[in-house]
């Protein structure tokens, strides 16, 4: 039964506003347990006998069975949904039973028992479940099971291959009749499952689980006869196990010998070398977690190996308690645990950078474990040479500050370390405290490394060494440290390889909660972090970009976010329209926004950026510098302007994708929807408080379609939205209506969105609609290259600026390394090089122009434009002309400035026309 809330909302509205959608458009009508009536009916007369038999087999209580049958009736009655699957009633019945059991918190069966009853695999089950609108509780249960399955599947495949490399399948010695490779595999896998459940609170941590599995493998190699082992494990095991001629059966292993076996690390060192694992981390897991577990297990047979039956009985207890997957079935290659043949989890590939002079290398498939290990190894290469303490260069920067920040920085790092260690242990397991300490040390190394790179970049840009304000800013340091830790945490998890929502419990925004850091403050450091750390992998850059998107779409809009205070201050200072970015949305987002700009703005403002084009005239430069230091108006926030511009681009990109799927027959509506969408974000930003960007997008689309008489139901919008790669069902099922009250997105549209924007929406039905907002320029990838150069269409030509040509000397801007003309630097036919290379190329181009002009005219070459030399009073001109009187010199410079400005303005106008024409196309 659909909810009645939309009807009540519609009845309260006057006739003029656009009509609300009918009740059947509610996309959440079958998503929650509260929407299904539980009236006592004679279900035995309605339900099919096979359904009743299935429920009896699974021992499903009557009220769960009734709920499951109602869910089935609703699923089977929806037009188009699960088309082709309705005939497979048994599978869908099982899914409906699962939904009802989860919603009612009554699960009398395990997930594997349900699978066996309906004869389906994990992936087939979840593929069908995704097609049904379910509650958030069911979504979470499904996500948890799927993540656990993925990790177990990857680990078992890895263990199976590892055992094949360690053990001989047909050993020549007769001593191994009681101990063979299959027996060791079974014992190792079940022991690992028990250890994982005992040691780790997180079920989906792939790296620590794999390290624990290596400990299990090491332990049972020590108890295996050398005749069963391959090299190099056989050589490493002989000093422990004795001569290969020594019979193993019946050996009396004293406590002293057992202790020696525990403390011997030769085999585990070989394992770590073979799998490229960090030996210190694995040893820590071995001594702090695995040895205490194995000693508490207390099950040992005469030959030193635990009995399979005893281990299996213990695991049975854990499995029945958790009511999820029976991972022992991996040993039998059971069809319920078969993987999807096209599943990317099993065939992930690690990108390989090819030498352009060589033929393209064939990229070989990697397992998830191998991929994560490679990523960790790349991080280790960067940080192995780094220090846990500030370098001499950093200390030099600290000493140059008005207020030396060193003591506060060291104290902050120490205090945060204690907090991180505690939170990590709470999330992963108390036995993993030392692992948390190791991860934190890596994060601190990266923190100091990136900080030093940032300061070097700022020094080159501004020609100053006193960064007292920035280095004494607590939020800057917490954000930079959080970003470094996020890189480390993501490297050790699979979240770098998939969407954030399917990451581990330590995935973003976990680090923000640990450090009590606001998402908007964290966002400020992401771009600078990526630009200055050139060794970040492509996957890590994508991960940080996803973090940035997550912040822009929802996390920055939480009630306690500093974003709202910044918006209020900005509006109070400069009026309601100042949220528009300074540069047009149709132009690329270029410019070297640094951490100093973001964290000290608007307390400090570098030169005011009024254009993102790469060519600036001397007059423009002079005007920008003067306005930055002499304006009396309140300074705009660089961080706010850049944030809004990025939000607009993310918003339009998603809207464009949705319109392409739903409104291909009405392309003119996209621009109108965008105008309403952008107006809401700019002027009705309170609607974003504790809400999601996509909620405003879908409401904007529906409102414009209604007022333009386009038949587009809200449910169709939601169905298309669910197919977007970043979409989550909670976005449209659980929308804030008012304080602590949540409902579906259609209720939000009727009771909140339309009420606030009623007048504005109706304007689009009039003969004089509002002026359409400009379409943002969408770059292919904002972080594709660290310096974000601009590529000119039609050729392999890139234009990129050097550092800022100004330094601050006694409050006045003065040129340092560049003049206005030398900012135009071109690289042709090659990748991006150093600034010196750009300067040489630029000089060559200028000289070529002069030679061509001289040969064409047959006379003396024209004098080049003179470079303005504000820093040296009375210096000779660049062309070697003699010294002129001050008045004549001033007039000459003024003429040059006017000429240059005119030329650049014409060039800008032509470029703007080109951009506009491209956007219209």
Swiss-Prot record:
Identify the keywords attached in UniProt to this record, alphabetized: Acetylation, Cell cycle, Chromatin regulator, Cytoplasm, DNA-binding, Methylation, Nucleus, Phosphoprotein, Repressor, Transcription, Transcription regulation, Tumor suppressor
Q: Does the keyword Transcription regulation apply?
A: yes
Provide the residue span(s) of the region labelled Pocket. Answer: 367-764
Q: Which GO terms describe its biological process?
A: aortic valve morphogenesis; apoptotic process; cell division; cell morphogenesis involved in neuron differentiation; cell population proliferation; cellular response to insulin stimulus; cellular response to xenobiotic stimulus; chondrocyte differentiation
Instruction: Return the Pfam families for the record.
Output: DUF3452, RB_A, RB_B, Rb_C
Q: Which GO terms describe its cellular component?
A: chromatin lock complex; cyclin/CDK positive transcription elongation factor complex; cytoplasm; nucleoplasm; nucleus; PML body; Rb-E2F complex; spindle
Q: Where is this region: Interaction with LIMD1?
A: 756-921
Show the GO MF annotations: disordered domain specific binding; DNA binding; DNA-binding transcription factor binding; enzyme binding; identical protein binding; importin-alpha family protein binding; kinase binding; phosphoprotein binding
**Residue numbers spanned by region Domain A:** 367-573
**Chain spans, region Spacer:** 574-632
Tissue expression: Expressed in the cell nuclei of renal tubules, hepatocytes and skeletal muscles. Expressed in skin (at protein level).
| N6-acetyllysine found at | 866-867
Modification sites for N,N-dimethylproline: 2
Where is the motif (Bipartite nuclear localization signal)?
Answer: 853-869
Entry-linked InterPro entries: Cyclin-like_dom (IPR013763), Cyclin-like_sf (IPR036915), RB_A (IPR002720), RB_B (IPR002719), RB_C (IPR015030), RB_fam (IPR028309), RB_N (IPR024599)
Question: Which residue intervals make up region (Disordered)?
Answer: 1-36, 341-360, 872-921
Q: Which PANTHER family match?
A: RETINOBLASTOMA-ASSOCIATED PROTEIN (PTHR13742:SF36), RETINOBLASTOMA-ASSOCIATED PROTEIN RB -RELATED (PTHR13742)
> Subunit structure of this entry?
The hypophosphorylated form interacts with and sequesters the E2F1 transcription factor, thereby inhibiting E2F1 transcription. Interacts with heterodimeric E2F/DP transcription factor complexes containing TFDP1 and either E2F1/E2F, E2F3, E2F4 or E2F5, or TFDP2 and E2F4. Interacts (when hyperphosphorylated and hypophosphorylated) with PKP3; the interaction inhibits RB1 interaction with and repression of the transcription factor E2F1, potentially via sequestering RB1 to the cytoplasm. The unphosphorylated form interacts with EID1, ARID3B, KDM5A, SUV39H1, MJD2A/JHDM3A and THOC1. (Microbial infection) Interacts with adenovirus E1a protein.
Q: Function, please?
A: Tumor suppressor that is a key regulator of the G1/S transition of the cell cycle. The hypophosphorylated form binds transcription regulators of the E2F family, preventing transcription of E2F-responsive genes. Both physically blocks E2Fs transactivating domain and recruits chromatin-modifying enzymes that actively repress transcription. Cyclin and CDK-dependent phosphorylation of RB1 induces its dissociation from E2Fs, thereby activating transcription of E2F responsive genes and triggering entry into S phase.
Q: Could you identify this protein by its name?
A: Retinoblastoma-associated protein
Organism, as annotated: Mus musculus
């Amino acid at each position: 039964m659909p909810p009645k809330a939309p009807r009540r909302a519609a009845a309260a509205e006057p006739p003029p506003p656009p009509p609300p959608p009918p009740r059947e458009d509610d996309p959440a009508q079958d998503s929650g347990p509260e929407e299904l009536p539980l009236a006592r009916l004679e279900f035995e007369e309605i339900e099919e006998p096979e359904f009743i038999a299935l429920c009896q087999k699974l021992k499903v209580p009557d009220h769960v069975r009734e709920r499951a049958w109602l869910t089935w009736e609703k699923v089977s009655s929806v037009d188009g949904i699960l088309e082709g699957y309705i005939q497979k009633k048994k599978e869908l019945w099982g899914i409906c039973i699962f939904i009802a059991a989860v919603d009612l918190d009554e699960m009398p069966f395990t997930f594997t028992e349900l699978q066996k009853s309906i004869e389906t695999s994990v992936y087939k089950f979840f593929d069908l479940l995704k097609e049904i609108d379910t509650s958030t509780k069911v979504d979470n249960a499904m996500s948890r099971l799927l993540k656990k399955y993925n990790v177990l599947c990857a680990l078992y495949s890895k263990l199976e291959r590892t055992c094949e490399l360690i053990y001989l399948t047909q050993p020549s010695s007769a001593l191994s009749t009681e101990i063979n490779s299959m027996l060791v595999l079974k014992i190792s896998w079940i022991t690992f499952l028990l250890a994982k459940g005992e040691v780790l609170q997180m079920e989906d941590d792939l790296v620590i689980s794999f390290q624990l599995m290596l400990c299990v493998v090491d332990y049972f190699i020590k108890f295996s006869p050398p005749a069963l082992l391959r090299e190099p494990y056989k050589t490493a095991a002989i000093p422990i196990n004795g001569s290969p001629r020594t019979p193993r059966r019946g050996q009396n292993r004293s406590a002293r010998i057992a202790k020696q076996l525990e403390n011997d690390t030769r085999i585990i060192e070989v394992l770590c070398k073979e799998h490229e694992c960090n030996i210190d981390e694995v040893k820590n897991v071995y001594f702090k977690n695995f040895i205490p577990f194995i000693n508490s297990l207390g099950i040992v047979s005469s030959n030193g190996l635990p009995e399979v039956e005893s281990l299996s009985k213990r695991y049975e207890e854990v499995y029945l308690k958790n009511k999820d997957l029976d991972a022992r079935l991996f040993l039998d290659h059971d069809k319920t645990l078969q993987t999807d043949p096209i599943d990317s989890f099993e065939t992930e590939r690690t990108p390989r950078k090819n030498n352009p002079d060589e033929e393209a290398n064939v990229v070989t498939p990697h397992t998830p474990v191998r991929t994560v290990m490679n990523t960790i190894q790349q991080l280790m290469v960067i940080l192995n040479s780094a220090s846990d303490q500030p370098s001499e260069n950093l200390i030099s920067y600290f000493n140059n500050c008005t207020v030396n920040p060193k003591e506060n920085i060291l104290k902050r790092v120490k205090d945060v370390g204690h907090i991180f260690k505690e939170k990590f242990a709470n999330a992963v397991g108390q036995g993993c405290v030392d692992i948390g300490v190791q991860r934190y040390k890596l994060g601190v190394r990266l923190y100091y490394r990136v900080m030093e790179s940032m300061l070097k970049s700022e020094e080159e840009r501004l020609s100053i060494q006193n960064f007292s304000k920035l280095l004494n800013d607590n939020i800057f340091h917490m954000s930079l440290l959080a970003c470094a830790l996020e890189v480390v945490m993501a490297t050790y998890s699979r979240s770098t390889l998939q969407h954030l929502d399917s990451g581990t419990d330590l995935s973003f925004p976990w680090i923000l909660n640990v450090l009590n850091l606001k998402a908007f403050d964290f966002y400020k450091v992401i771009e600078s972090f990526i630009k200055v750390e050139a060794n970040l992998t492509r996957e890590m850059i994508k991960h940080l970009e996803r973090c940035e998107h997550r912040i822009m779409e929802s996390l920055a809009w939480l009630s306690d976010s500093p974003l709202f205070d910044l918006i209020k201050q900005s509006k109070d200072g400069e009026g309601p329209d100042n949220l528009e970015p300074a540069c047009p949305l149709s132009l690329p987002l270029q410019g070297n926004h640094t951490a100093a700009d973001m964290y000290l703005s608007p307390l400090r403002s570098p030169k005011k950026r009024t254009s993102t084009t790469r060519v600036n005239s001397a007059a423009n430069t002079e005007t920008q510098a003067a306005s930055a230091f002499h304006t009396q108006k309140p300074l705009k926030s660089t961080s706010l302007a850049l944030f809004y511009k990025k939000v607009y681009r993310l918003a339009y990109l998603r809207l464009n994708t949705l319109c392409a799927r739903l409104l291909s027959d009405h392309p003119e509506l996209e621009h109108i929807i965008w105008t309403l969408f952008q107006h809401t974000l700019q002027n009705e930003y309170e609607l974003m408080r504790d809400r999601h960007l996509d909620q405003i997008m879908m409401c904007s689309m529906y409102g414009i379609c209604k007022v333009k008489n386009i038949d587009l139901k809200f449910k169709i919008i939601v169905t298309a939205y669910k197919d977007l790669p970043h979409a989550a069902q909670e976005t449209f099922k659980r929308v804030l209506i008012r304080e602590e009250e949540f409902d579906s997105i259609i209720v939000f549209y009727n009771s909140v969105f339309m009420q606030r924007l009623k007048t504005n929406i109706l304007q689009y039905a009039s003969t004089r609609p509002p002026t359409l907002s400009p379409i943002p320029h969408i770059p292919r990838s904002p972080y594709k290259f660290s310096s974000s150069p601009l590529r000119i269409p039609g050729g392999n030509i890139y234009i990129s600026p050097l550092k800022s040509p100004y330094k601050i000397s006694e409050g006045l801007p003065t040129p340092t390394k560049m003049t206005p003309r030398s900012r135009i630097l071109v690289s042709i036919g090659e990748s991006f090089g150093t600034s010196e290379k750009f300067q040489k190329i630029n000089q060559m181009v200028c000289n070529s122009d002069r030679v061509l002009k001289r040969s064409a005219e047959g006379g003396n070459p024209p004098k080049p434009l003179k470079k303005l030399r504000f820093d040296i009073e009375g210096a000779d001109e660049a062309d070697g002309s003699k010294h002129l009187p001050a008045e004549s010199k001033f007039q000459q410079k003024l003429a040059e400035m006017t000429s240059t400005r005119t030329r650049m303005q014409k060039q800008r106008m032509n470029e703007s026309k080109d951009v506009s024409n491209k956007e219209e196309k």
